[in-house]
A protein has these predicted regions:
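Short glycine/serine/threonine-rich phosphate/pyrophosphate-binding segments
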Residues: 8-18, 41-42, 76, 92-95, ...
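C-terminal non-catalytic interaction/assembly regions of soluble proteins
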Residues: 263-392
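Short, glycine-rich nucleotide/cofactor-binding loops
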Residues: 2-12, 235, 326-328
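Accessory alpha-helical/coil subdomains and C-terminal extensions
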Residues: 99-100, 104, 111-113, 119-123, ...
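Glycine-rich nucleotide/cofactor/substrate-binding loop typically near the N-terminus or early
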Residues: 22, 27-104
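Glycine/threonine-rich beta-strand-loop-alpha-helix active-site module
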Residues: 19-53, 122, 126-171
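Short, ordered loop/turn segments at secondary-structure junctions
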Residues: 4-6, 34-39, 72-73, 114-115, ...
Length: 392
């Protein structure tokens, strides 16, 4: 097994769940873990799941992070693998990985990651098959963006929304630290606004239930979210600024929740026009943490709102590093149990609720897995949220 990509509140629990299931139904199966994802596979860095590890596997459900380490490695990006010292010049990373799996006697590979991780696993399985080595690959869908096609709910996303709302609750208390305060809460989500919307909904729900004194800065109106911006919902800055200026004038603060993917096309276009290099990761994705969408939004709104102070905060690392909540733990258990059972049947795929098959939990074919699933901004819970905060 291996975990790969960024963290999510499911990795530790998923590793624990896989170990527990194998111990329960196939205790004689040898289980190893590659450290630091595909980097460990390329370097032959693996550890045995011992009897002691099996006995303590249940403890992994209480923690965030991953017990076996992660990395962002694309096996088909030869140049990057060579640059990072994972393979030598002239070597094919797919061949190196295949040889390592063969040497280790691996006939089932469990990958826990996003669409890139699982598509890479599919590439590896296809390469092995073409070279006469059969490998069953069973993936688990990890991404807090909840943007994997055709999977209804990715592991860890519910927890990330809950934790992002907790983060926002404390950050938004800063509205009382300065007159005319603009707070921008930047939420992870490259191409999909689901996490931003779900985080805003969770925070708004808390505001509705909280018992405020309704005195000056301690009021629902000053603690609530005032606007939610996601990539899938275009908006006019001038129109929004006019609406938000009225909120600033009345309540002395404005709290925005924005997806890190909102406004990226405009930012990238401006950088390219200025002749600046756009930073990208090994998968070709724009490195959002280096172009700072939150700062861009703050700059667009600050003057128009007459803000005296601007605070931009990112909840991503806080929310993605949490231990899984009860809802995610239940989903993780269903998926890890199914993943092991599928592996023992020799059935490859990514385990999840298949939206195109009536939300059936199954091993979804790799050629149907893709990233970039769009958030449905017509979802009733989201349109109701926008209506309640005056943004509809």
């Amino acid at each position: 097994m291996l975990t790969a990509g960024g963290l999510a509140p499911c990795l530790s629990s998923a590793v624990g769940g896989l170990i527990e299931r194998y111990t329960a139904v196939a205790p004689d199966v040898r289980v190893i873990a590659y450290r630091n994802g595909y980097a460990g596979l390329l370097k032959g860095d693996s550890v045995e799941v011992t009897a002691q590890v099996r006995a303590n596997a249940h403890r992994l459900h209480a923690f965030g992070g991953t017990p076996i380490g992660n990395s962002r490695v694309k096996l088909t990006n030869v140049k990057d693998c060579v640059k990072r010292g994972l393979v030598h010049e002239g070597q094919d990373p797919l061949h190196v990985a295949a040889e390592q799996l063969s040497r280790d006697g691996v006939d089932v590979l469990h990958t826990i990651g996003g669409d890139d991780t699982n598509v890479t696993a599919a590439d590896l399985a296809a390469y092995l098959r073409s070279n006469g080595y059969e490998l069953t690959v069973v993936g688990l869908p990890k991404t807090i963006d909840n943007d994997v096609v055709p999977i209804k709910q990715s592991l860890g996303a519910w927890t990330a929304a809950e934790q992002g709302a907790l983060y926002a609750r404390n950050i938004i208390a800063e509205h009382s630290s300065n007159p005319r305060m603009l707070i921008v809460h930047e939420v992870m989500g490259r191409n999909c606004g689901w996490l931003t919307a779900a985080t805003a909904l969770a925070h708004h729900g808390w505001v509705q239930q909280a018992r405020f004194a309704e005195w000056l800065e301690n009021s629902a109106a000053t603690w609530d979210v005032h606007a939610v911006f996601v990539p899938e919902r275009p908006f006019g800055i001038a129109d929004e600024a006019k609406r938000l200026r009225a909120i600033m004038d009345e309540h002395d603060c404005v709290n925005l929740f924005i997806s890190e993917g909102a406004g990226v096309s405009e930012i990238v276009a401006a950088m390219e026009q200025a002749g600046e290099e756009v930073p990208r990761d090994p998968f070709g994705h724009v490195q959002l943490d280096k172009i700072n969408p939150g700062q861009w939004f703050a700059k667009q709104f600050a003057a128009a709102l007459g803000a005296d102070k601007v605070l931009v905060q990112k909840s991503g690392y806080f929310s993605r590093s949490a231990a899984a909540n009860r809802a995610d733990l239940d989903l993780i258990r269903q998926c890890t149990d199914y993943a092991v059972d599928a592996a023992l049947r020799g059935e490859s795929g990514v385990v999840g609720q298949d939206e195109e098959r009536g939300d059936e939990l199954r091993a979804i074919e790799f050629d149907r897995i893709a990233g970039g699933k769009k958030f449905d901004v017509t979802a009733p819970w989201f349109t109701e949220l926008l209506r309640e905060i005056g943004q509809a």
